[in-house]
Amino acid sequence: MRTSLGRLILLTCVAALTSSSASVVGASGYASIGADSAMRAAPASAGATLTFRRIFKSSSPEFIEISVREDSDEASYEIRQLDDDPGATKFEVSSGLRARMFALAQQLNRFQGQDLDVHRKIANLGEKTFRWEQGPETHEVKFNYTLNSTASQLLQIFEGLARQQELLMLLERRMKYDRLGINDALLQFETELNRKLLPEPERALPTLDQIAGDSRFVDIGRQRARNLAERIRHQS
């Protein structure tokens, strides 16, 4: 009887120990898997967004804002008069141009502690703002005119993108509502292309090809569109 009782107690202890060990291993295993899953699910730090804004009353346009994302070709622009309804439109900026823009912003310390304005009595050229946003981090700097070469390079790119989108908007309006005026719009595009002010003129190729192939437009306009498209492809 005593022997049987002793064996029963021993078996009970072994079973309890085995169950406890399995629970610990199981808990450990699930904790490890959970941690791995959490690490895999945790999003990478969000890419930065670079924004340029210019407000220049009594000019045309009075308001320009362009936002470019570090991790995406998708960007947005808003070009209008101040009295117009606000609303951004999507467009694309290549990875190469974005890399250059963000490199310039980094050289400006992401606009932290920067004083870019020339601080001289000169004409009002419009209030310009550079803004860096990345998660909770936000920095911006405002200026009228700057002599900082790095800031000037970044400004030239942003203003070039704005002018590029303005011209594309003009071409699209003429295509829809004023086909006889298409050649004048193409001349404006050609002038800016000659001045090398358009950062990515290849963005206009689909529009130029459409004009060149559409018999509803005047021949001189179609030929100019064809020549511009050929020139841009050759330069690219």
PLM ranges: what are they?
Residues 65-69, 88-93, 136-147:
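Short amphipathic beta-strand/extended segments with alternating polar/hydrophobic composition
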Residues 39-84:
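N-terminal secretory signal peptides
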Residues 77-113:
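A short-motif feature that recognizes glycine-rich, charge-decorated loops
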Residues 1-10:
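Bacterial N-terminal signal peptides that target proteins for export
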Residues 22-56, 115-236:
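Short, well-ordered, aromatic-rich surface patches in folded extracellular/luminal domains
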Residues 75-77, 96-102, 147-158:
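Short, surface-exposed linear segments at secondary-structure transitions and domain or protein termini
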Residues 9-19:
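Bacterial N-terminal signal peptides
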Residues 74-89, 187-191, 205-209:
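Acidic/histidine-rich, surface-exposed loop or edge segments in extracytoplasmic proteins
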